[in-house]
Amino acid sequence: MASSVFLSSFSSSSSLQLCSSFHGEYLAPSRCFLGAPVTSSSLSLSGKKNSYSPRQFHVSAKKVSGLEEAIRIRKMRELETKSKVRRNPPLRRGRVSPRLLVPDHIPRPPYVESGVLPDISSEFQIPGPEGIAKMRAACELAARVLNYAGTLVKPSVTTNEIDKAVHDMIIEAGAYPSPLGYGGFPKSVCTSVNECMCHGIPDSRQLQSGDIINIDVTVYLDGYHGDTSRTFFCGEVDEGFKRLVKVTEECLERGIAVCKDGASFKKIGKRISEHAEKFGYNVVERFVGHGVGPVFHSEPLIYHYRNDEPGLMVEGQTFTIEPILTIGTTECVTWPDNWTTLTADGGVAAQFEHTILITRTGSEILTKC
């Protein structure tokens, strides 16, 4: 989950300014789904961990009121008549149904019981043989759930119905839907439609032919999280949108291709940026990949854009890569629910995500089904 991915932060580094065209700042529960630059490396050049103090994470973004949202929709409609780039109708909030229940016998991640939003763990997650077997099981389940969710994407289906189906499949497998209750997130999956970059909350809005939708699934099984997402087409989709989605998936593949024991993390962002720019798309810098395993979000933070951050991959590490590409701006606005994050200009966004395991000669995609 990204989205985060699902990580968030705001550091003093000048290399990243979250939603920098906006003046207001606010603290949001979604801070554990967004990312900002690492100010110190967790690994030395020898591959050993360096010690440092945990960073404080928060999001800096424009939180829109009801009036501002109405103005945004009006401006988007005006753009529809002037722009040569096709735009779907502006995304509108639907009704969010009550939180679904999870049977008592299913183990919960620690953050659910405590009710406290966890900090980003500074520990790299290297599970070991037994842990890797459990990671494979969690990731395989997440991949199967995501495949099933994709079959439900049709015109007139609501994202709330997709959430219910995903929730039921996860608990039937004896697992817990990791997003549910994370920092107050009210649903079991993220559904991000059209201009929604990430962290869309499932609601009563019906999908329409021409929509694209990212579904982000994370499951907690036997003490380990498996995290993956994919962007799907609903009905007849514009060729320009299809191209964006194709290139985004290719960016993920190219980022994964550079991963192996001893490789530099910054190679991921370089490879993704090169491919996106070749087609004229923009890479969102605010959302990062992250370590995943027994802990939902941890170091290393994976930047999907060009960067000079130090750090080397180590055999046995597990983390996500989850680039988001946009047709237009990468600036964002966040709805009052403190989660749903949209492109500021209404341009569509696409995202793909895998959890990978670093090996001596390359990497293994754990969420490939």
Swiss-Prot record:
Whether Metal-binding counts among this entry's keywords is: yes
Q: Which GO terms describe its molecular function?
A: initiator methionyl aminopeptidase activity; metal ion binding; metalloaminopeptidase activity; mRNA binding
EC number assigned by the record: 3.4.11.18
Question: What cofactors are annotated for this protein?
Answer: Co(2+); Zn(2+); Mn(2+); Fe(2+)
Detail which positions bind substrate. 199, 297
PROSITE patterns reported in the protein's UniProt record: MAP_1 (PS00680)
Q: Which of this chain's residues are annotated to bind a divalent metal cation 1?
A: 216, 227, 353
How, per the record, is the cofactor bound? Binds 2 divalent metal cations per subunit. Has a high-affinity and a low affinity metal-binding site. The true nature of the physiological cofactor is under debate. The enzyme is active with cobalt, zinc, manganese or divalent iron ions. Most likely, methionine aminopeptidases function as mononuclear Fe(2+)-metalloproteases under physiological conditions, and the catalytically relevant metal-binding site has been assigned to the histidine-containing high-affinity site.
Q: Which SUPFAM superfamilies match?
A: Creatinase/aminopeptidase
Q: Which GO terms describe its biological process?
A: N-terminal protein amino acid modification; proteolysis
* EC class: hydrolase
Q: Name one Pfam family in it.
A: Peptidase_M24
- GO CC terms, sorted: chloroplast; extracellular region; mitochondrion
Q: Which residues bind a divalent metal cation 2?
A: 227, 290, 322, 353
Query: What keywords are assigned to this protein?
Result: Aminopeptidase, Chloroplast, Hydrolase, Metal-binding, Plastid, Protease, Transit peptide
Compartments, record wording: Plastid, Chloroplast
Kindly state which reaction or reactions the protein catalyses: Release of N-terminal amino acids, preferentially methionine, from peptides and arylamides
Matching PANTHER family: METHIONINE AMINOPEPTIDASE, METHIONINE AMINOPEPTIDASE 1B, CHLOROPLASTIC
Q: What is the similarity comment for this entry? A: Belongs to the peptidase M24A family. Methionine aminopeptidase type 1 subfamily.
Q: Name the chain's protein.
A: Methionine aminopeptidase 1B, chloroplastic
Point out the gene that encodes the protein: MAP1B
